[in-house]
Design a protein with these regions (language model features):
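Phosphate/diphosphate ligand-binding glycine-rich loop within oxidoreductases
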Residues: 2-102
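Glycine-rich adenosine-cofactor-binding loop
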Residues: 8, 94-99, 104-129
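Structural motif
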Residues: 52, 109, 149-151, 168
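Short glycine-rich anion-binding loops that position phosphate/pyrophosphate groups of nucleotides
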Residues: 55-62, 118, 154-158, 174-177
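ADP-ribose/adenylate-binding Rossmann-like module
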Residues: 76, 82, 163-195
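Active-site capping/gating segments
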Residues: 102, 187-220
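NAD(P)-binding Rossmann-fold cofactor-contacting core
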Residues: 113, 127-144
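Rossmann-like NAD(P)-binding element
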Residues: 143-163, 170, 174
Length: 220
C-alpha cells in the first residue's frame, strides 16, 4: 500500500499528520520520518512504499540535491517542501511559495527574518509580487526595523523582535510562536494558517487527488 509522510527534525509534535488525514479521510497512512540523518531518510523514501513526503527543517534545502526533477517554484526558492516519486525519479516541489504569495498580498515592503528554507521561499514570494525584500538573520535585529509586511521564520524568540513595526506579520512557527504578542504589529497571521495553505496547495501534487479543503481548514 502506498504511503506518505513528513521528513524533518524535530517533528514529533507536528500537526501535518492530522491535516493529511483530514484531507483524505484517513485513506492513506502518513508517517513521521524523524531524523537528523537526511541520507537515512532518503533511503527509506526510495526503498519503502512512499509515494511522496512533505519536507520540513532542516532538510528543505538538502532536498534539492537528491531530486532528479526540480519544479520552477522549488528552483526559485532554492528549497523544496515536497518530494514525489514518479517513474523512478524524485521530483522536488515547493508549495510554500504560493502560500506566501497569498498571505503577503499587495505589500509595499517586505522584511524576511531567517534565511532557512522557509525564509528563502518568503524572499522568492516577495520578488514574485515585485518587491525586493530585506533579509535579516536572528542576530541582526538590534536596530528597530519597519516594513509593510514581515515574514518571521525563526524557530524561537530572538532579542530585537519586540522592536518590529509592521502592518502585517506572518509567522512560520506554529508550535511555539514568538511573534503573536509583539506590540508593533497590526495584523498577525499564525503559522497554522501558513501550514494549512501550503498543505492545501501541495497535497494534490503528492497524491494526484484533490484534498477535502473544508476538512483541512477545520482540522486545527
Amino acid at each position: 500500500m502506498i504511503k506518505f509522510g513528513l521528513a524533518g527534525y524535530p517533528i514529533a509534535d507536528s500537526l501535518s499528520p492530522r491535516l493529511f488525514d483530514a484531507a483524505y479521510h484517513g485513506n492513506w497512512p502518513y508517517e513521521l520520518l524523524e531524523s537528523t540523518d537526511f541520507e537515512a531518510v532518503i533511503k527509506r523514501f526510495r526503498t519503502e512504499d512512499f509515494k511522496a513526503i512533505n519536507v520540513t527543517a532542516p532538510f528543505k534545502t538538502l532536498a534539492l540535491g537528491v531530486s532528479d526533477v526540480i519544479s520552477e517554484e522549488a528552483r526559485r526558492c532554492g528549497a523544496a517542501n515536497i518530494l514525489v516519486r514518479k517513474d523512478g525519479r524524485i521530483e522536488a516541489h515547493n508549495s510554500d511559495l504560493m502560500a506566501l504569495i497569498v498571505m503577503i498580498g499587495l505589500a509595499k515592503s517586505v522584511l524576511v527574518i531567517g534565511g532557512g528554507g522557509a525564509g528563502k521561499a518568503a524572499i522568492s514570494a516577495a520578488r514574485t509580487i515585485g518587491v525586493e525584500p530585506v533579509l535579516r538573520h536572528h542576530d541582526e535585529l538590534a536596530e528597530p526595523l519597519e516594513a509593510d509586511v514581515v515574514v518571521c521564520t525563526l524557530p524561537r524568540y530572538a532579542p530585537g523582535l519586540e522592536h518590529i513595526r509592521c502592518r502585517k506579520l506572518i509567522e512560520a512557527n506554529y508550535k511555539t510562536p514568538c511573534c503573536d504578542a509583539l506590540p508593533g504589529i497590526k495584523e498577525y497571521i499564525p503559522g497554522t494558517t501558513w501550514l494549512k495553505l501550503q498543505a492545501i496547495l501541495g497535497y494534490e501534487l503528492m497524491t494526484g487527488e484533490k484534498p477535502d479543503v473544508k476538512a483541512v481548514l477545520g482540522a486545527i
